Amino acid sequence: MTLANIKSAKKRAIQSEKRRQHNASQRSMMRTYIKKVYAAVAAGDKSVAEKAFVEMQKVVDRMASKGLIHANKAANHKANLSAQIKKLA
């Protein structure tokens, strides 16, 4: 299982692995929401893109507040996608 011999080190290894899996799942979910907005923009559907953007914004902000991604990365995602949605006629 782990290379750790000390009980506390074994526990930390188990907790780290559990946290890693949870974070990976959260990161994947966030990326999916972002991709939905990009797909709507690529299709040229402004109303769908705006709805997807609102959902994506909530998720990205939540991930930033929990420390999964940096706040600036969240801001960059929101700014870039918002600009692309505004370009749609």
Swiss-Prot record:
GO terms for molecular function: small ribosomal subunit rRNA binding; structural constituent of ribosome. One of its GO terms (biological process) is translation. It comes from the Bacteria. InterPro entries: Ribosomal_bS20, Ribosomal_bS20_sf. Residues 1-28 are annotated as: Disordered. The keyword Ribosomal protein applies. Keywords: Ribonucleoprotein, Ribosomal protein, RNA-binding, rRNA-binding. The keyword Ubl conjugation does not apply. GO terms for cellular component: cytosol; small ribosomal subunit. Gene3D superfamilies: Ribosomal protein S20. Binds directly to 16S ribosomal RNA. Belongs to the bacterial ribosomal protein bS20 family. HAMAP family: Ribosomal_bS20. NCBIfam families: S20. This is Small ribosomal subunit protein bS20. The lineage of its organism: Bacteria, Pseudomonadati, Pseudomonadota, Gammaproteobacteria, Pasteurellales.
